[in-house]
Amino acid sequence: MIFADRHQAASLLAQALAAYKGQHPLILAIPRGAVPMGQQLAKALHGELDVVLVRKLRAPFNPEFAVGSIDESGWTYVADYAASAGASAAYLEQEKQAQLAIIRQRRTQYTPLRPPIDPAGRIVIVVDDGLATGATMISALHALRAKKPAKLICAVPVAPPDTLEKIREYADEVVCLQAPAFFQAVGQFYADFPQVDDAEVEAILSQA
């Protein structure tokens, strides 16, 4: 299945998550692409919207390919293939510091007037527009688990089967609309997949 756009994907996810409507779930979107989807889910499920800030650690010769990820606390997930992708320990340390600086800058930028919403005791749904390696989602789920949510759910429109297996170790429930065996990039499953910029994220979060 090819999704028309993120709006359609979010509508279908909302249907799949309908059991949580009325339970005031906390929808945490991974910026930037998933933030408009998170807004839609929060409205459909009568929930609350915020962002969870994590960054992928980029492979040295292919910045689109993740060799790990880092969360706001500095906790780092390093994939078992990182070294074979050319990521030395020194490179990873440099990349961690660079991505952590971006996370801190984005927190100030995205929610300047309030602290992050506390997920403790809440049904938490972490949404992204799709998973490739799953590294970013793993960091998001790990960071949130430490904050003791009542239930931690990963919700994505599309991800490859091997990635979903890894994600299941970190979430109480995984909702994925399709898991194709042939998977190159998230964008191949959307007819329209525009970039979401910081201004759009800020506008959405200012209304949340």
Locations of regions flagged by a protein language model:
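PRPP-associated nucleotide enzymes
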Residues: M1-A208
